Design a protein with these regions (language model features):
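Periplasmic/extracellular, small/polar-rich flexible segments of pilin-like filament-forming proteins
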Residues: 49, 53-137
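Aliphatic-rich helix starts adjacent to a transmembrane/signal segment
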Residues: 31-48
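N-terminal single-pass transmembrane signal-anchor helix
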Residues: 2-32, 36
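Compositionally biased non-globular segments, especially hydrophobic aliphatic-rich helices
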Residues: 13, 42-45, 73, 131
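Conserved short hydrophobic patches within well-ordered secondary structure
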Residues: 3, 19, 41-44, 104
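Hydrophobic transmembrane-helix microenvironments that flank and shape a buried ionizable site
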Residues: 10, 44, 52-53
């Protein structure tokens, strides 16, 4: 009788490894999807903060906010707001009221959520605090 040394993995060991990889993937994939959504929302909020900065700079110079509305602010088909250019995939719409206040909303092509900000006027939904961007849940 000869003693053969068997090398390699058994079928059970391979199945256990596959199950562990499956569990790790099931945990990781939703986390990555959520990260993408957070990045879209951060981009939209950043653009709204940039509009706020642009509006405040204009107000510091002329004691009024930029008046008139604009759809797709800074976009190829929209009105430029003092050189503001939105992030890729973001569309920003702005309205103003007689130079004493303004509101802006932003959307992203990668999500159905909307973010908004306002100063000197009733903030648009979902914004609730003046000057602070907020997004729909």
């Amino acid at each position: 009788m000869s003693n053969k040394i068997r090398k390699g993995f058994t079928l059970i060991e391979l199945l256990i490894v596959v199950v562990i990889i499956g569990i790790l993937a099931a945990i990781a994939i939703p986390k990555f999807a959520n990260t993408k959504e957070k990045a879209y929302l951060a981009s939209m909020k950043s653009d709204l903060r940039n509009i706020a900065t642009t509006q405040e700079a204009y107000f510091a110079d002329f004691q009024v906010y930029v008046t008139g509305g604009a759809s797709n602010v800074g976009g190829a088909t929209g009105t430029t707001l003092n050189g503001f250019v939105p992030s890729s995939g973001v569309t920003v719409s702005s309205t103003a009221s007689g130079g004493t206040g303004w509101t802006a909303t932003s959307t992203h092509s990668g999500t159905s959520k909307t973010c908004a900000i306002g100063v000197g006027m009733t903030p648009p939904t979902p914004a609730t605090v003046e000057g602070e961007p907020k997004c729909t849940p």
